[in-house]
């Protein structure tokens, strides 16, 4: 059974919980890269300087966890105030990564993308253009970041998925 098949067999709440767990485990990769300082970069379109807050990924994880725990009748407020505001913080950096305006080590980039995809999943659910669930993509990216960053090996990930 492939990783995707195993993850697809889980209920949605378990998939999201697994994605959050892996992303929290990968957070030291991001923190090691930022070392508590904003990431600065210049975009190639208008040569404007941008900053990424060093706590952006931690705030994203916390906001998603708060959103999940919120009573159903308050989730729309959580969505509007917390998650959608965070999503706008990802817009410019995602474009700049795709335009190669900034180059990060692969584990850092994967951790950043995993946070973005989990946030998008939490806001609107859905799939990628090639049919993968956004939450699966986030899990896969976080797991890849953990492996490439030397934090977790494949067999440990398999055990973690089985425990979920």
Enumerate the language-model features and the residues they cover.
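Structured binding/interaction patches within domain cores
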Residues: 1-164
